[in-house]
C-alpha cells in the first residue's frame, strides 16, 4: 500500500476513534445518572412509604443495565479503532523511516556472531524493521527464522507463493494486526504455562467424588425449598451448605492451581477467538496457507474451543468475589462444577491447543515477511538457483533511510572477492547489504533490490570482532577463531558464503598479509563464496588463485571528502587516512 493510502485510512480510523470516544463519554455520564437516580428513587420510596417508587427504581435499574450493555459494545468499538489507528500509524512510521522507534527490537536474541555482525536484532535492526508479531510464539518463530533461515529451495518457493497471495489480502492483514494489537497481555510464559497445564492429569483428584457432588447440590436445593414449609429442615439445609463449603475449601488449592494459567490470559481470549475466526473465514489458495488454516478451521474447533474456554474463564473470574464465592459454592459447589466443565474442555480440546497457537504464530511470521512489500519499499522476490551463484541489481541496505541509501549491482565472476577502499567509503555496509538480503531471501521474504539470483548458502561472518577480557581472548585471537570456523565448515563441502571485514586487523601488517593470503587460499573452493575487505593492497594480487577485485571511491571538493558509495571493479587507487588526520588536526 502507498503512503497516501495509509494516511487516508489513518484519518478515517482517527475520526471513528473520536466518534466512539465522545459516545463513550456520554454513555458514562448517562449510566452514572441512571444508577444514582435508581438509588434515590429507591430511598425516597422507602422513607416515604410509597411502593410505586420501587417499580420506578426497578425500571431505572433495568435501563441502567441496558445502557451498561450498550456502553460495553461502544467501548469494544473504541478499543478496536484505537488499535487500528495504531496499526496504521506503525505502517506510516515504517514508510517514513521512523521504524527504529518501535518497542520490540528483539534485543534478547542478540547472542550469536552473525546476529551482531549483520544487525539482525537490537535497536535499528532487521527484526525491528519487519516484525509484525504480537504473541510470544510469533516473536520466537520470527527470531528463529532470522537466526536459522531455511536453506530448502522448495520451502522458500512455497513461502514466496504465500506472500504473493497475501498481497491480495491487505484488509485481512490489517484485521489480524488490529486484533493482535488489542491483546491485553504479552507475558511470554502465560500461554506456555496454560498449554503445559493441559498435558497434566487433573481428573483423578475428583474421580471418587464425581457422584457425591451432584447429590449434595440436589440435597441443598431440596432443603432450601422445603425449609419454607418445614421449619425443622433448616438444620439439614445449613448442614448441606456447610458441608459443601468444607468440600470447596478442601479442593480450593488444587482448583486454584488448575485455573491459574487460563485466568492469566482471560482478557485476551476474545481476541484470540476473533483472530481464529478471521483466519478460518478467509479464502486461500497457496498450500502453506491452506495447511495453516486447516489447523484452525477443522470442524471450527479453534473458534468453538476458545469460545467455550472464554465462558469458563469468565466463570472462574467470579471466584475473585469472596461473597459470591461463598454463596455459589454453598448452594451449588460452584468450584467443582467449573472444574468439571474445564476438565471436559481439556479432554475435548487440550491436544489441539498447541497447533492452534502454532498456526497463529506462523501467520504472524508470514505477515512479517510480507511487511517490506506491504509498506511500499522497493523490493522484489529473489530467484533461487541450484548452482553456486550470486548476482543482483540496485541492491540496497534494508536499514538505511530510503531517501539516502545507495544501491549497488554485482555479478559473481570468481568465488573470492577482495574489496578495498578508503575509510567510511561503504565496504562493510556493502557486505551487510548482501548478508541481510540473503537472509531475507532464505526466509522467503523480499530483497531490497532487483533481479537477485542466489543459491542457498550457509552464512558465516567475521566483522564486529571484539576482545573478551573474561575469557582472555584478544581481538586478533577472536578473528582467528572466526576464520577457523569458516575453514572447518568448508570441509563439509556444503554451499557457504563468508563475509570478512578488515581481516586480521588486530595484528601487524606482515602477519596480517600472510594470514589473509592463507585464508584466501583455504576458502577458494567451488562451494564457497567469500567477500573480504582490506586496506592491504598486497592482497589484491594473490598468485595462483583467481579473485575479483572491487573498490569504493571518494572524491574531494572544497577541502571536504565525499563518497558515492558505489561499487567499482578493480583495486582502489586512493586513501583518505592522512586527509582525515589533517582535518582533525592530528598531523
What are these regions (language model features)?
Residues 68, 369-587:
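ATPase nucleotide-binding head domains, primarily ABC-like/P-loop NTPase cores
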Residues 1-421, 429-458, 481:
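Alpha-helical coupling/stalk and coiled-coil linker elements that connect catalytic or binding modules
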Amino acid at each position: 500500500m502507498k503512503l497516501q493510502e495509509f494516511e487516508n485510512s489513518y484519518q478515517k480510523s482517527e475520526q471513528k476513534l473520536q466518534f466512539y470516544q465522545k459516545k463513550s463519554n456520554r454513555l458514562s455520564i448517562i449510566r452514572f445518572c441512571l444508577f444514582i437516580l435508581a438509588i434515590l428513587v429507591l430511598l425516597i420510596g422507602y422513607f416515604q412509604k410509597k411502593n410505586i417508587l420501587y417499580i420506578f427504581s426497578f425500571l431505572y435499574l433495568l435501563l441502567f443495565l441496558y445502557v451498561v450493555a450498550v456502553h460495553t459494545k461502544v467501548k469494544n468499538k473504541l478499543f478496536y479503532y484505537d488499535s487500528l489507528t495504531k496499526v496504521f500509524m506503525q505502517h506510516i512510521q515504517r514508510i517514513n523511516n521512523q521504524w527504529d522507534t518501535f518497542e520490540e527490537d528483539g534485543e534478547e536474541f542478540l547472542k550469536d556472531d552473525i546476529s551482531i555482525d549483520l544487525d539482525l536484532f537490537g535497536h535499528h535492526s532487521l527484526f525491528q524493521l519487519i516484525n509484525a508479531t504480537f504473541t510470544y510464539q510469533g516473536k520466537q518463530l520470527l527470531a528463529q527464522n532470522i537466526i536459522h533461515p531455511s536453506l530448502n529451495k522448495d520451502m522458500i518457493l512455497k513461502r514466496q507463493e504465500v506472500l504473493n497471495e497475501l498481497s491480495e489480502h491487505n484488509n485481512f492483514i490489517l484485521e489480524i494486526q488490529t486484533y493482535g494489537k488489542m491483546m491485553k497481555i504479552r507475558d511470554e510464559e502465560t500461554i506456555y504455562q496454560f498449554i503445559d497445564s493441559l498435558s497434566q492429569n487433573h481428573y483423578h483428584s475428583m474421580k471418587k467424588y464425581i457422584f457425591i457432588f451432584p447429590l449434595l447440590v440436589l440435597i441443598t436445593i431440596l432443603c432450601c425449598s422445603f425449609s419454607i414449609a418445614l421449619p425443622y429442615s433448616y438444620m439439614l439445609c445449613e448442614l448441606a451448605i456447610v458441608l459443601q463449603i468444607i468440600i470447596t475449601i478442601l479442593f480450593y488449592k488444587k482448583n486454584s492451581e488448575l485455573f491459574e494459567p487460563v485466568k492469566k490470559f482471560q482478557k485476551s481470549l476474545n481476541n484470540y477467538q476473533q483472530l481464529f475466526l478471521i483466519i478460518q473465514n478467509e479464502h486461500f489458495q497457496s498450500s502453506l496457507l491452506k495447511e495453516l488454516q486447516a489447523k484452525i478451521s477443522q470442524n471450527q474447533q479453534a473458534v468453538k474451543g476458545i469460545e467455550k474456554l472464554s465462558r469458563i474463564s469468565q466463570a472462574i473470574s467470579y471466584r475473585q468475589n469472596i461473597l459470591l464465592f461463598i454463596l455459589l459454592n454453598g448452594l451449588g459447589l460452584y468450584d467443582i462444577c467449573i472444574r468439571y466443565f474445564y476438565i471436559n474442555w481439556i479432554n475435548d480440546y487440550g491436544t489441539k491447543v498447541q497447533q492452534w497457537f502454532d498456526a497463529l504464530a506462523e501467520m504472524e511470521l508470514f505477515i512479517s515477511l510480507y511487511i517490506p512489500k506491504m509498506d511500499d519499499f522497493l523490493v522484489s522476490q529473489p530467484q533461487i538457483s541450484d548452482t553456486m551463484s550470486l548476482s543482483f541489481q540496485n541492491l540496497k541496505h534494508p536499514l538505511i533511510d530510503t531517501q539516502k541509501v545507495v544501491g549497488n549491482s554485482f555479478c559473481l565472476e570468481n568465488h573470492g572477492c577482495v574489496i578495498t577502499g578508503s575509510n567510511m567509503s561503504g565496504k562493510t555496509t556493502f557486505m551487510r547489504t548482501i548478508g541481510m538480503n540473503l537472509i531475507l531471501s532464505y526466509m522467503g521474504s523480499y530483497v531490497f533490490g532487483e533481479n537477485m539470483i542466489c543459491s542457498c548458502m550457509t552464512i558465516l561472518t567475521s566483522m564486529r570482532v571484539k576482545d573478551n577480557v573474561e575469557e582472555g581472548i584478544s581481538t586478533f585471537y577472536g578473528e582467528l577463531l572466526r576464520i577457523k570456523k569458516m575453514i572447518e565448515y568448508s570441509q563439509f563441502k556444503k554451499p557457504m558464503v563468508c563475509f570478512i571485514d578488515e581481516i586480521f586487523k588486530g595484528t601487524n601488517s606482515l602477519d596480517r598479509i600472510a594470514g589473509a593470503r592463507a585464508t584466501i587460499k583455504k576458502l577458494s573452493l567451488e562451494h564457497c563464496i567469500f567477500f573480504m575487505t582490506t586496506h592491504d593492497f598486497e592482497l589484491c594480487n594473490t598468485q595462483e588463485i583467481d579473485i575479483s577485485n572491487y573498490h569504493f571511491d571518494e572524491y574531494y571538493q572544497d577541502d571536504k571528502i565525499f563518497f558515492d558509495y558505489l561499487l567499482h571493479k578493480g583495486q582502489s587507487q586512493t586513501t583518505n587516512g592522512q586527509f582525515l588526520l589533517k582535518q582533525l588536526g592530528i598531523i
